[in-house]
Curated annotation (Swiss-Prot):
Protein's recorded name: Guanylate kinase
Similarity field: Belongs to the guanylate kinase family.
Originating organism: Rhodopseudomonas palustris (strain BisB18)
NCBIfam families: guanyl_kin
Function: Essential for recycling GMP and indirectly, cGMP.
Any one GO MF annotation of this record: ATP binding
Origin superkingdom: Bacteria
Location(s), subcellular: Cytoplasm
Any GO CC annotation of this UniProt entry: cytosol
Enzyme Commission code(s) on record: 2.7.4.8
SMART domains in UniProt: GuKc
InterPro entries assigned: GK/Ca_channel_bsu, Guanylate_kin-like_dom, Guanylate_kinase, Guanylate_kinase_CS, P-loop_NTPase
PANTHER family for the chain: GUANYLATE KINASE, GUANYLATE KINASE-RELATED
Length: 219
C-alpha cells in the first residue's frame, strides 16, 4: 500500500526521442522493428511526406500525406522537428504528435540519418538519445546488401560509397552498437533505452517523491 502523500505515481517521467541511425544494410530497420514489437511504451515516429500514397498505405499510420504547399507551410511555421528532400519528395517529422507523446511519458523511435539526427538535437537536445549502428566489417556490410537482393550491383556500390561518409559522423552519437549478431545488438540497444528511461532528469516528480520520503523518515 502506498503511504499518504506523493506515491509511486509521482515517479512519472518525460518520454524521450530514441534515434537509430546506420549505413544501409547495418541493421537499423530490423532493430527498429524488433524494438516496436517487443518494448512497451515505445512508438514509431510517423513522418509527413509529399510523395504519393502507395497501395495499402494509410494516412496517419504509415505517413501523413500532404501536398508541397502544406509541407512548405509546416517548415515555415516550425511545425517540423526535422525534414529533408529525397528524390524530389519531402519528408519530415511533425512536432505536435511527438511532443504530445513525450509529455505523457511515451518514447518515440526515429529511424533517420545523421542529418535528421542533427536537426533533432538542435531543436530538442535534452529529449534526444541517439544510437549509431555499425556493421562488423565492410565485407559483412556488402554481403548483407547482396543478401537482401533488393538492389543492383551499381546501387550497392553507391550504398557502400555513402556508408563511408555516414560513418564519419559516428562521433556525433551518444552510443555506438556493432551489429555482429542481431539478437545481441537488440539486447544492447534495449539496455540503452532502459537505462535512459531511468535517468534522474526524466523523472518529473522525483523531487517531490524524495521530499515526501524525507518527511516520512523524520516523523
Amino acid at each position: 500500500m502506498t503511504a499518504p502523500g506523493h506515491g509511486l505515481e509521482s515517479l512519472e517521467r518525460r518520454g524521450l526521442m530514441f534515434v537509430l541511425s546506420s549505413p544501409s544494410g547495418a541493421g537499423k530497420t530490423t532493430l527498429s522493428r524488433l524494438l516496436i514489437e517487443r518494448v512497451a511504451g515505445l512508438k514509431m515516429s510517423v513522418s509527413a511526406t509529399t510523395r504519393t500514397k502507395r497501395p495499402g498505405e494509410e494516412d496517419g499510420r504509415d505517413y501523413y500525406f500532404v501536398d508541397h504547399a502544406r509541407f512548405q507551410a509546416m517548415t515555415e511555421n516550425a511545425e517540423l522537428l526535422e525534414w529533408a528532400n529525397v528524390f524530389d519528395n519531402c519528408y519530415g517529422t511533425p512536432r505536435a504528435p511527438v511532443e504530445a507523446a513525450l509529455a505523457v511519458g511515451q518514447d518515440v523511435l526515429f529511424d533517420i540519418d545523421w542529418q535528421g539526427t542533427q536537426q533533432l538535437r538542435e531543436k530538442a537536445r535534452d529529449d534526444v538519445v541517439s544510437v549509431f549502428i555499425l556493421p562488423p566489417s565492410a565485407a559483412d556490410l556488402e554481403k548483407r546488401l547482396h543478401t537482401r537482393a533488393q538492389d543492383s550491383d551499381e546501387v550497392i556500390r553507391g550504398r557502400m560509397s555513402r556508408a563511408s561518409h555516414e560513418l564519419s559522423h559516428f562521433a556525433e552519437y551518444d552510443y555506438i552498437v556493432v551489429n555482429h549478431d542481431i539478437d545481441e545488438a537488440f539486447a544492447e540497444v534495449h539496455s540503452i533505452l532502459k537505462a535512459e528511461r531511468l535517468k534522474r532528469e526524466r523523472r518529473t516528480g522525483l523531487t517531490a517523491f524524495v521530499r515526501d520520503l524525507q518527511k516520512q523518515l523524520e516523523r
